[in-house]
């Protein structure tokens, strides 16, 4: 049976507690230590990844949308990637996904080369 409701929208109260302007800085800061997980945060019909997670998501989904953003209170531009809820649903049918909350899911990946991330990040900021 097809579920038309996005995965992260099952409990809208939870979704709003994870991805808020107050939390953006914490989420971006946590990415600095991230080497093997893609942290995705629901916005309803889309899932967003920041910085290192965004880099790894772009490798997994080469056609994902890439965005640059300035986050209030964070001194540097941030690179984000975004995929549609239905793309994530398709992926999760064949892969193990952790879901700490309905609005946050974690995909396990291989460790990446930090110099590859730095080059990708620079290119995205200068695009």
Residue map of PLM features:
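Basic, polar low-complexity surface loops/patches
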Residues: 2-127
